[in-house]
Amino acid sequence: MPVLDLIDAVEQAYRDVAGGRDASPARSRVAMPNGDLLLMPGLRRGGLGASVKLVTVTPANAARGLPTVQAILLWIDAETGAPRALLDGAELTAMRTGAGTGAATRLLARADASVLAQIGAGAQAAWQVRAVLAVRPIRE
C-alpha cells in the first residue's frame, strides 16, 4: 500500500472512531509473570469486520535476543464471527503509528517544513520517517 494511501486510511479511521462510526474500546492489560498482555479490540461498522490485536511486552526478551514487543492481529467477519485473517501485529502497529505521524504532520506542520529529527531507531522508526517524507519536502 502506498504510504499516502495508508496515511489517508488512518486519518479516516481516526475520524470514524471520533465520530462514533467505528468503535475502538480502551485496551485491556493483563499482567503476566515476565511482562504484560495487551488486548485491543476494534469494530468497523457497516459489516466491514472486527479485530483484536494481542500484544505481549516482555522486557527480558532483549537479553534472549528476541523482540520485547510481539503482536498478532485477528481479523473477524463482523456478520458471521468467523476468523478471516491472522496478521503480523508488530508490522501493522509500526505502519499505523507511522501513518498517524504522517497525518499529524500533514495537519500540524508548516507546508514548507524541510528538516526532520528522528529520535530512536526502534521498530517503528522507518515508518515514522516514510510517513513524514510522504507529506513534507524534507531535505535534511
Predicted segments with their positions:
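Short, intrinsically disordered, charge-balanced linker/junction segments flanking boundaries
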Residues: 1, 136-140
